[in-house]
């Protein structure tokens, strides 16, 4: 079939979704056409693994997808976790210090299927509305282990201070990156969308002749770079545009039809 062996991984927010966080009919139709012709489509997002089933039930994913900014690869069809990377070491003392110093900033701890929050704010509420995740305010001692990702949500300037505070602590074991202007993600150092794509290519590569990835934010740069064909949307950060092979229109213009047009010269 036309797209046999071709895999597309797309970021969600700022890429596949428009400025209102909507998934357009044009993108859905293009994805369904791509899959019907033998293609494989997955997402690579900072969101939890539940988000696509809850918020985008019509989105067909037929390849294991990348969640938590690369800390987990999850097959939404089978419910199988292919791999996950959890934060090692005890972050609780550091997080307690930061949520005390920055009380206006929300801290969220992601564990498989659930999240625990401190200092809930409006940005958290926006996240809950758009992602459909389950959160709980809990005591530190009641939070289980195997943390996949920690988020801070707040004013960008405050988040820059928190990032700088982590840098001062010399926490080289962590990967700290902005997934959005008002969200700072913290994961194990080895966890990234690009690293997850590399692992998936090593697992399925013999059946994948061309891997395409699309993104917009700094956390997508390695994903775009590690693809055979890396694409930045027009609203992408300079870091993503620098490593991309092509730059298409911004996320308010459906990206998948543009990608399929670009693919014509690779078939």
Residue positions per predicted region:
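Mg2+-dependent phosphoryl-transfer enzymes with acidic/Ser/Thr/Gly-rich catalytic loops
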Residues: 2-7, 24, 185-267
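Active-site phosphate-binding/coordination module
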Residues: 20-124
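Short active-site oxyanion
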Residues: 38-42, 62-63, 148-149, 209-210, ...
């Amino acid at each position: 079939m036309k797209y046999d062996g071709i895999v597309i991984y797309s970021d969600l927010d700022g890429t596949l979704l428009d400025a209102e966080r909507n998934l357009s009919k044009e993108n859905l139709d293009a994805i369904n056409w791509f899959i019907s012709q033998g293609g494989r489509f997955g997402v690579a997002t900072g969101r939890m693994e539940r988000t696509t089933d809850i918020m985008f039930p019509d989105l067909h994913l037929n390849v294991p997808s990348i969640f938590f900014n690369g800390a987990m690869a999850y097959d939404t069809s089978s419910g199988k976790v292919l791999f996950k990377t959890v934060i090692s070491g005890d972050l609780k003392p550091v997080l307690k210090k930061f949520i005390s110093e920055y009380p206006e900033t929300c801290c969220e701890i992601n564990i498989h299927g659930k999240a625990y929050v401190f200092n809930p704010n409006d940005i958290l509420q926006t996240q809950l509305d758009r992602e459909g995740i389950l959160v709980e305010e809990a005591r530190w001692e009641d939070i289980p282990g195997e943390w996949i990702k920690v988020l801070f949500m707040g004013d960008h300037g405050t988040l820059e201070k928190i990032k700088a505070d982590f840098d001062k602590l010399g926490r080289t074991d962590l990967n700290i990156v902005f997934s959005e202007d008002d969200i700072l993600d913290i994961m194990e150092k080895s966890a990234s969308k690009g690293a997850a794509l590399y692992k998936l290519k090593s697992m399925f590569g013999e059946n994948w002749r061309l891997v395409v990835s699309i993104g917009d934010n700094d956390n997508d740069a390695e994903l775009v770079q590690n693809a055979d064909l890396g694409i930045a949307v027009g609203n992408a950060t300079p870091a993503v545009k620098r490593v991309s092979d092509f730059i298409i229109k911004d996320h308010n213009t459906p990206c998948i039809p543009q990608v399929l047009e670009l693919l014509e010269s690779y078939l």
